[in-house]
Amino acid sequence: MSTHDPISDLITRIRNAQMRAKSKVSTPGSKMRANVLEVLKSEGYIRGYATLEHASGRSEIEIELKYFDGEPVIREIERVSKPGRRVYASVKNLPRVNNGLGISVLSTPKGIMADHEARDANVGGEVLFTVF
């Protein structure tokens, strides 16, 4: 099954799995999803992920979700830029999520990165989603 917006699909799968207190969730594999998950892992929002290759040639990513005292580490995850309405930000206008307690994940010319990394690299880009 193909999805029109793989990032929204990934976010929804994570949100739904955490509402059901699942320890792991699977999603179809792609480089974009793996790069987004790498940012979430480096920022401490998920435990990790693994890419699984099937005999049919399709790949799947298994995500290990993270909890603290039984509560999900990700309190809020929200898509900002959508296929019908793209949202771009220059380095000067990068949004701060809850006064710096959360992060914005951006797609920049230098790859997918968190907002503080984009500020350090002095690049702007498409604001994919925010996490708190």
From Swiss-Prot:
Single GO BP term: translation
Entry keyword set: Ribonucleoprotein, Ribosomal protein, RNA-binding, rRNA-binding
PROSITE patterns: RIBOSOMAL_S8
InterPro entries: Ribosomal_uS8 (IPR000630), Ribosomal_uS8_CS (IPR047863), Ribosomal_uS8_sf (IPR035987)
Gene Ontology MF annotations: rRNA binding; structural constituent of ribosome
SUPFAM superfamilies membership: Ribosomal protein S8
One GO CC term, this protein: ribosome
Alphabetized Pfam families for the sequence: Ribosomal_S8
Family: Belongs to the universal ribosomal protein uS8 family.
PANTHER family the UniProt entry points to: 40S RIBOSOMAL PROTEIN S15A
Function of the molecule: One of the primary rRNA binding proteins, it binds directly to 16S rRNA central domain where it helps coordinate assembly of the platform of the 30S subunit.
Subunit and interaction comment: Part of the 30S ribosomal subunit. Contacts proteins S5 and S12.
Protein's recorded name: Small ribosomal subunit protein uS8
Organism: Rhodopseudomonas palustris (strain BisA53)
Lineage, broadest ranks: Bacteria, Pseudomonadati, Pseudomonadota, Alphaproteobacteria, Hyphomicrobiales
